[in-house]
Regions:
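Flexible, acidic loop-helix segments that line cofactor/substrate-binding pockets
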Residues: 1-4, 31-43, 67-79
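Structural helix-boundary/capping segments
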Residues: 3-4, 11-24, 79, 84-86, ...
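A generic structural motif
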Residues: 25-29
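Short, surface-exposed loop/helix-turn segments at secondary-structure junctions
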Residues: 86, 118-139
Length: 209
């Protein structure tokens, strides 16, 4: 979507998976709607939600809340109406862009995350392929950007890294187009042969490649 850095291996795996759509008789293009301003708009709306739900908790139990969450809540408390209106305008404009996109396209496809799975001991990702992340949620910004579209989305596995870690794509359908989206996702998953495959071998804990 051109909004955050993408790990080279993830981009390669997802790009290779697009060949399966071509094999299914689908024309694949590099066309993408304009997502300018979407991340900042989402961050503003998210912060307002955090402040709405958690400001009382922050007052009572600040020491028990992670610093990143405190930052979200405090940001939300500082956001004014003008910023909320601006974020909502971005959301509305994006929805219109998606409708225009779907006049000539059936689906929008992109990676499910910017990086492969990282160690459970690691709280969050601070850089992607050497490029620093602006926030602690940048590594999955490509998912919440699609939340802003108000379109149906499904995530489907599409391959594995060299170390056996799973990688997936998100398929976005036109609203309301859940039935067509699920059919396309099922056909894609079957074409990859991953429908019944375990990402991790339960006997040895190693990835299946």
């Amino acid at each position: 979507l051109g909004i955050v850095p993408m790990a080279t291996e993830v981009a390669h795996i997802c790009g290779a998976a697009m060949g399966h759509f071509t094999g299914m008789g689908v024309e694949v293009t590099a066309d993408v709607p304009d997502f300018t301003g979407v991340l900042e708009a989402f961050q503003s709306l998210r912060a307002v939600l955090f402040a709405t739900l958690m400001a009382p908790i922050l007052e009572q139990n600040r020491v028990q809340i992670a610093p990143e969450i405190i930052g979200n809540i405090e940001r939300g408390l500082k956001i004014d109406l003008a910023q909320i209106f601006a974020a909502e305008r971005v959301r509305i404009a994006l929805y219109q862009k998606m409708l225009t996109f779907f006049e000539s396209h059936d689906f929008l496809i992109c990676p499910a995350a910017s990086i492969p799975p990282f160690p459970v001991e690691q709280r969050f990702v601070t850089e992607i392929d050497g490029k620093p992340c602006a926030t602690y949620i940048d590594w999955f910004a490509i998912t919440f950007a699609l939340t802003m579209t108000a379109c149906p989305v499904v995530s489907v596995p599409c391959g594995f890294t060299a170390t056996g870690l799973p990688v997936g794509v998100q398929i976005v359908g036109k609203p309301p187009g859940e039935a067509a989206l699920l059919r396309a996702a099922r056909q894609f998953e079957q074409s990859l042969g991953l429908a019944k495959q375990l990402p991790i071998n339960p006997h040895n804990g190693r990835g299946v490649i």
